[in-house]
């Protein structure tokens, strides 16, 4: 079996269908004895250029190990699904399991915002932090 990296983009009006689509594609791959090494739902993102007058799409990244038959069936499912506006399949030399740079950036953004929220919640004196800034400057 070979390793593949698959990215597909779903029409933004069909975003609520993405989890069902992922499960269907997972069944195709695992039903043929394949494995999914990495699955990332990147969510809605701005497109670099409009596709059929659409400016946003829901992105999904999958790193899989599967046979030729399962891959052909998966690509066929992409082609005949009107909700999938683009897809790309790349042959990889090995399986990638670590988070992609985009997913790492999102995790850092989430941790930064939660730390910022915790810091804001800990400041309970009700002022605008002007006296806190003056005290730290002294």
From Swiss-Prot:
InterPro entries given in the database record: Ribosomal_bS6, Ribosomal_bS6_CS, Ribosomal_bS6_sf, Ribosomal_S6_plastid/chlpt, Transl_elong_EF1B/ribsomal_bS6
A Gene Ontology BP annotation from the UniProt entry: translation
Protein name: Small ribosomal subunit protein bS6
UniProt xrefs under Gene3D superfamilies: 3.30.70.60
Keywords associated with the record: Ribonucleoprotein, Ribosomal protein, RNA-binding, rRNA-binding
Chain residue ranges for the region called Disordered: 100-138
Stated family: Belongs to the bacterial ribosomal protein bS6 family.
Sequence ranges of Acidic residues compositional bias: 121-131
Annotated signal sequence range: none
Positions of transmembrane segments: none
Source species of the chain: Thioalkalivibrio sulfidiphilus (strain HL-EbGR7)
Domain of life of the organism encoding this protein: Bacteria
Biological function: Binds together with bS18 to 16S ribosomal RNA.
Sections of the chain in a coiled coil: none
Organism taxonomic ancestry: Bacteria, Pseudomonadati, Pseudomonadota, Gammaproteobacteria, Chromatiales
Gene Ontology MF annotations: small ribosomal subunit rRNA binding; structural constituent of ribosome
A matching Pfam family: Ribosomal_S6
GO cellular component: cytosolic small ribosomal subunit
């Amino acid at each position: 079996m070979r390793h593949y990296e698959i990215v597909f983009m779903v029409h933004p009006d069909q975003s609520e269908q993405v989890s069902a689509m992922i499960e269907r594609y997972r069944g195709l791959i695992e039903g043929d004895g394949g494995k999914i090494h990495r699955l990332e739902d990147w969510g809605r993102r701005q497109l670099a250029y409009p596709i059929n007058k659409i400016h946003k799409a829901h992105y999904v990244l999958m790193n899989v190990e599967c046979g030729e038959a399962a891959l052909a069936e998966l690509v066929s499912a992409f082609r005949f699904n009107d909700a999938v506006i683009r897809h790309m399949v790349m042959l990889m030399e090995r399986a990638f399991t670590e988070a992609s740079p985009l997913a790492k950036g999102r995790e850092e953004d989430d941790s930064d915002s939660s730390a910022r929220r915790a810091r804001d919640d800990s400041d309970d004196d009700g002022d605008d932090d002007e006296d806190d800034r003056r005290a730290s400057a002294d």
